[in-house]
A protein has these predicted regions:
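A beta-strand signature from Gram-negative outer-membrane beta-barrel systems
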Residues: 88-90, 189-228
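Extracytoplasmic beta-strand/coil segments of soluble accessory domains associated
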Residues: 137-176, 203
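Periplasmic-side early beta-strands and strand-to-turn transitions of outer-membrane beta-barrels
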Residues: 224-225, 244-319
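Short, acidic, small-residue-rich periplasmic hinge/interaction motif at the N-terminus
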Residues: 26, 37-41, 69-73, 83-129, ...
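Outer membrane beta-barrel strand-and-loop segments of large Gram-negative receptors
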Residues: 283-285, 363-369, 407-411, 504-508, ...
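Structural signature of Gram-negative outer-membrane beta-barrels, strongest in the C-terminal barrel
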Residues: 329, 376-389, 393-541, 619
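Short acidic/polar hinge/loop motifs at secondary-structure boundaries
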Residues: 55-58, 148, 175-203, 217
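Outer-membrane beta-barrel domain signature, especially the mid-to-C-terminal portions
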Residues: 273-276, 314, 347-350, 440-443, ...
Length: 704
């Protein structure tokens, strides 16, 4: 406490090291421009011009640049040191084809592809919608070097860097949503509709220290009026639609959408599909902001799914509801504070020949985030608490458990202002986190699963060096961490109920020591020059008490055990290139892993490749995708208690998409034809053909 008071005292002194900036923005005709984004670098202090084109804010005295950016106008960069108050800045209009449906405003993206000390990939959901992916899981699997696992009951989950799917953290506008009894988020119930972007982060991060991967869904929140509709048709009874509409102004926005879809799967010895899946989606977003850096967001979605396997008799029904309220206040001199509330309700029925489970999860959560620049430093504090009640009926047994889950994270980062050239230390950061969990089962459940309390601490250190050359930036970064993962309620239930060996009953936290080092290279994104970006990272993870899933043979049932010590080393890379006129684009994603024990990392290939070529010629766009994976292994156990090692063969597939985009005034129409797995090389799991050959027709129409 004494040191905290000292830090706060000096912070108050340092915060006064600012200077006022005042000016105005006009166009070539001398008319004022409002809602122009003005950002001071490197502190990222920002504001917007008002309806008279005037902007007033304070910036740290060490800032060097003031950047003015507005849709449809050339970006202007001014010298912050030489800037004279009262300056009138003229922005020149440019002719560009804008993305009409959504502009991701300041603060919407949670991660920077270059600045974040991780591998960060941002997916364009408008492009994903055009190409007619079945769901978000299908899109991520096609685009990136990640593993998608699909159970016999149609649940789709992904893993990054050979980690367990339970490690993944899913965010909705920066708020974690996989906080229920089962941390696996079924990606088959999400489509690209409703999102303006998707961020994929590989490796541990301050927002999720124990995870090897993060996915952040950026919800659409268009401050303006727009609408869109897409319709899909395809083989194996694939079809669906998504509709979106938005009304609003520069200060208020209300939008929403609905969607439905269905598809089928086939057994390799069958002539027609025997597995069907249908899903429904609804979402709504409300945004209210003023001209003083205050914004309120209210977001909600309700997704449902019905799965039926007519051969086995297995069926699944899911209804997932989420409501999020968020208040964001950004300071004109840098930093921001966020408060949020979360309400979740999840209903699920899973029926097989072996059992029937009715799941009802109700979660109420709240939290905050606070960050403040302190001269050449940044202090951040984050906290969240979730109150979860799980009411599960398993055959004739009823289990009611309450879990209180609290996380508090603090970080302190020293930031060196970037010079125009040369090699320099960019930043160093230390992150400390405290995680508290308390499980309290119903009294009738005590003899099956006891009360448990965990109090664990994690830490991480990050640092980076940057080199700025002519038209190019290079960053070297490293991450060191000692983190943990606590068992979910679903893992604890499954372990107690389904373990076949008395010695494996009871789960303890999984610990992980992690090390990562990487390099990022990118050139200046100039319309007059080709653009490229390279990201290569190597890492090592060492697990203690690793939690591993065991599959029961012939039924869609898994249960976890603590496997013991295991380690993983590897590297992944991402390369992207765009020609000068953007008619040719190439991206490549590659991953290679070394396992101390392959059976400790279920269904994980040791090599993955994704290559994509995009050609844009006038109204036409052609996408060619090649992807390959090495063989995968999984451990199962039969009715006699014997462990069996199973294998999925290596796979290499080719996809293609041809689209036609036409624009007339404020309307845009799209027609695309997609073919997946054109070489018809599929994998087989439990007799079901995975990633089989499919053809889709997609139609889209949008306004503004």
């Amino acid at each position: 406490m004494k040191y905290l008071l000292i830090i706060l005292f000096f912070s108050t002194i340092l915060l006064s090291q600012t200077k006022p900036i005042q000016g105005s923005v006009i166009d070539e005709k001398g008319e004022p421009l409002f809602n122009v984004n003005i950002v001071s670098k490197p502190s990222n202090t920002g504001t917007q011009s008002d309806d008279k084109g005037v902007f007033i804010f304070e910036i740290p005295i060490h800032d060097q640049q003031i950047i003015l950016d507005h849709i449809g106008y050339e970006q202007e960069t001014l010298n912050a040191i030489l800037f004279k108050n009262g300056t009138r800045v003229t922005l020149m209009q440019k002719v560009v084809e804008l993305k009409p449906l959504d502009v991701t405003g300041a603060g919407r993206e949670q991660f920077s592809p270059f600045e974040t000390k991780n591998s960060v990939i941002i997916l364009d959901t408008e492009e994903l919608a055009v190409r007619g992916f079945v769901d978000i899981g299908d899109a991520l699997f096609s685009e990136q070097s990640i593993v998608m696992n699909e159970t016999m009951n149609g649940q789709k989950s992904i893993s990054v860097r050979a980690s367990a799917p339970e490690e993944m953290i899913y965010l909705y506008d920066g708020i974690r949503i996989n906080t229920l009894g089962d941390p696996l988020l079924d990606l088959s119930i999400f489509s690209a509709s409703g999102f303006s972007g998707i961020e994929l982060v590989k490796g541990g991060h301050e927002k999720a220290l124990s995870s090897s991967g993060i996915i952040n869904f950026i919800p659409k929140l268009t401050y303006g009026s727009s609408a869109s509709f897409t319709q899909q048709f395809g083989t194996y009874n694939y079809g669906g639609f998504d509709g979106f509409g938005s009304i609003g102004s520069s200060l208020v926005s209300l939008n929403g959408g609905i969607g439905e879809g269905q598809f089928s799967q086939i057994y390799i010895d069958a002539e027609k599909p025997e597995i069907t899946t249908s899903h429904q989606r609804q979402f709504g977003h409300l945004g209210i902001k003023n001209r003083y850096n205050l914004e309120f967001r209210f977001m909600g979605f309700k997704n449902g799914k019905q799965f039926q396997n007519y051969r086995t008799g297995n069926s699944v029904s899911i209804d997932m509801e989420n409501i999020i309220g968020k208040m964001i206040h950004s300071s004109p001199i840098g930093g921001e504070i966020i408060f949020f509330g979360l309400l979740q309700n999840n209903l699920g029925i899973e029926s097989t020949n072996s059992y029937t489970i009715n799941k009802e999860d109700l979660n109420n959560g709240f939290g905050f985030s606070f960050e403040k620049p302190i001269r050449s430093a940044m202090a951040k504090f984050n906290g969240e608490t979730n109150y979860l009640t799980s009411n599960w009926d398993i055959d004739s047994l009823t289990f009611i458990t309450k879990r209180v889950n609290s996380i508090f994270t603090g970080s302190f980062e020293l930031v060196q202002p970037e010079r125009n050239q040369g090699i320099q230390l960019k930043d160093v950061k230390i992150v400390l986190s405290k995680h508290l969990i308390s499980d309290t089962p119903d009294s009738s459940f005590d003899e099956i699963m006891d009360t448990e309390t965990w109090d664990e601490s994690s830490s991480m250190f990050t640092g980076s060096i940057v080199s700025i050359m002519s038209q190019k930036r290079i960053m070297l970064y490293t991450n060191l961490g000692n983190v943990f993962r606590l068992p979910s309620l679903n893992e604890r239930f499954s372990n107690h109920i389904r373990s076949t060996n008395q010695g494996t009953i009871g789960l303890i936290p999984e610990y992980k020591n992690q090390f990562e080092m990487g390099i990022k290279i990118e050139n200046e994104n100039d319309n007059e020059k080709p653009y490229y970006a390279i990201n290569i990272s190597g890492f090592n993870y060492h697990y203690s008490n690793k939690i591993k899933q065991i599959q029961l043979t012939g039924v869609p049932i898994q249960f976890p055990i603590n496997y013991g010590e295991a380690s993983l080393s590897g590297f992944d890379s991402n390369l992207s290139f765009s020609s000068k006129t953007k008619w040719f684009n190439f991206s490549s994603s590659y991953a290679y892993y070394l396992f101390s024990d392959p059976m400790a990392f279920q269904l994980q290939p040791d090599k993955m490749v994704r290559n994509k070529i995009t050609l844009k010629i006038r109204w036409f766009q052609l996408d060619l995708i090649q992807r390959s994976e090495s063989a995968r292994q999984i451990t199962s156990i039969n009715s006699t208690g014997t462990f069996l090692d199973n294998r999925l063969d290596a796979i290499q597939t080719y996809d293609a998409n041809l689209s036609l985009k036409l624009k007339f005034r404020e309307y845009k129409g799209t027609i695309s034809i997609s073919g997946k797995n054109l070489n018809n090389e599929s994998q087989v799991l439990n007799g079901i053909s995975l990633f089989d050959q499919r053809y889709n027709l997609n139609l889209g129409l949008s306004w503004k």
